UniProtKB/Swiss-Prot annotation:
PANTHER family named among the record's database cross-references: GLUTATHIONE S-TRANSFERASE THETA-2-RELATED, PTHR43917
Protein name: Glutathione S-transferase theta-2
Subunit structure: Homodimer.
Keywords attached to this entry: Cytoplasm, Nucleus, Transferase
EC number: 2.5.1.18
Species of provenance: Mus musculus (Mouse)
Length: 244
């Protein structure tokens, strides 16, 4: 069995892995895991990843369940262009520096709107307005940190070429944009960075990867989304309760 990637393109890390593999011509089989239908909680998927999360990489009997580890593994195994995950010690350390900050600040912050506007209402849960406003303030703060600490006057987050850092960041920032919050507005430096990253990746690949999330609000308004099965409601409610 060749390389298998378990993905749901509603998921930011899934999109990052998908785009990376496609952009670099890495052969793989897509195993779609539809989160809205609760497929991530199925017994079948639990045998692949007992954490019940996507993305997952399965390479024969070898399994990885964290997106950063998956991207690094693919970079090394398929010997992709050095700029993605530089061999230079200091450049690589800077990629890891960003990814560590990303996990603590970007990840979890920019996905909240999906829960407040789509996932919560699907199961009849309303996120308190004060949490929504707090999240908006947090996004503004983190975006400023992203510009001041990482982007600065550079073309990309770690120097003058695209790295794994840019890909992971772009996919997180696309989440609120797709849900009606244009966080790039009034941020010309960040907007120019996004345009450079998307130009490098290619418009067709970006559209393919982003089509699911970009259509989510329209589908929700037309009540075209599947209602998650009752057995996943408890885990969804817990996730919503954890929104700071």
């Amino acid at each position: 069995m060749g390389l298998e990637l378990y993905l749901d393109l509603l998921s930011q890390p899934s999109r990052a892995v998908y785009i990376f593999a496609k952009k670099n011509g890495i052969p793989f089989q897509t195993r779609t895991v539809d989160i809205l239908k609760g497929q991530h909680m199925s017994e079948q998927f639990s045998q692949v990843n007992c954490l019940n999360k996507v993305p997952v990489l399965k390479d024969g009997s070898f399994v990885l369940t964290e997106s950063t580890a998956i991207l690094i593994y693919l970079s090394s195994k398929y010997q992709v262009a050095d700029h993605w995950y530089p061999a230079d010690l200091q450049a690589r350390a800077q990629v890891h520096e960003y990814l560590g900050w990303h996990a603590d600040n970007i990840r979890g912050t920019f996905g909240v709107l999906l829960w407040t506007k789509v996932l919560g209402p699907l199961i009849g849960v309303q996120v308190p307005q004060e949490k929504v406003e707090r999240n908006r303030d947090r996004m503004v703060l983190v975006l400023q940190q992203l510009e001041d600490k990482f982007l600065r006057d550079r073309a990309f987050l770690v120097g003058q070429q695209v790295t794994l850092a840019d890909l992971m960041s772009l996919e997180e920032l696309m989440q609120p944009v797709a849900l009606g919050y244009n966080l790039f507005e009034g941020r010309p430096q960040l907007t120019a960075w996004r345009e450079r990253v998307e130009a490098f990746l290619g418009a067709e690949l970006c559209q393919e990867a982003h089509s699911t999330i970009l259509s989510i609000l329209g589908q929700a308004a037309k009540k075209m989304l599947p209602v998650p099965p009752p057995e996943v409601h408890a885990s969804m409610q817990l996730r919503i309760a954890r929104i700071p």
